[in-house]
């Protein structure tokens, strides 16, 4: 097995390499998941001697891994590390990479592309022309794949000329989270849940992906992307699909992907006539988070410019099918919000009739909260009687399943799981090209409608939960946002 992270940046390695990829690979080493002769070859523009590269990786692990680094595992891991200088924007030098990989022709090769999406197609072509794509070769593409439907299709076509669809792994690390995987078990392994998982019992669904950090060093990249493209098109629509999809015939990747594609194609288009009623677009200004003053988005760009890129989005999405008709999915995501939290809230309908006296209190509708971060788990609010004599006093209490409390053994994080799935040739946790293109088709409708109605990003103060129009979005429907766990 050979893992080749190909970086396109001038400095050689993307932030994802340092924060996610390298720690994930090292954890696999700690768990003895690599064969003895496996190699990890990092390719970048930098002319980096091997000993300097090994020291660079060690520094990255010390910075991004909690606790001490296992000395024995590090010794094995360091032996696997190699660096190759390659400018992925150049037509030359690829034969040298072929020489570096010589002797591994019968091994699984994983090409992990951490670069601008516009380079995915040309890089795949260069790999093929240099004879690097052997029978066991797989390619990993980071999100977002493209900037819109047309660019996504072009990238998929270009990469598809070299790699079979079954060997293309479009990675979305949210799909590797244990709680996301547990959505399948929660829905389809519990007879208590599935009969209620429909419009008759569920009032609405909320999906929140909130960050308290700003764009920071990624501001230049983010200004070309925005929250709608960066978060909604992939992470949030994938979560929506897992909540809304019908039961697949099996856990085979073709069955799972097929059901998700049906959901994406059933999303009601957002048009210029509806866009102001069902979407909110915001951009953070300066404010305070955890008692510290933080700059606004335009200040972080490092130059005076009137950027209209959104850093916050709220959307009322509707799935037009029999299961979910008239049951809205409210999505919100943004940067510089009041806390870091990702969760799905399934709000059930109130009981049809209360048998309790007024002084007992009104029974609160049940609510299921599926937490993705910071503490992965599932919480179900149930109405119970407060202990004591006299009349009934009702109170909602949570039944809480916290994975960290229940399972004391460390389980692989999202990137670790996904990398091992790539090596095992298991594509169920990755996106098919039809998913990517169907998602872009819906997202493009929002972008075009924003432009048609000249709907600009409205300012919100850092450290809040986004623009106040997001509150009004639900208030118009007689609903309100649930307070996220932070």
Question: Could you tell me what each predicted segment is?
Answer:
Residues 1-141, 145-486:
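Secretory/organelle targeting and membrane-embedding segments
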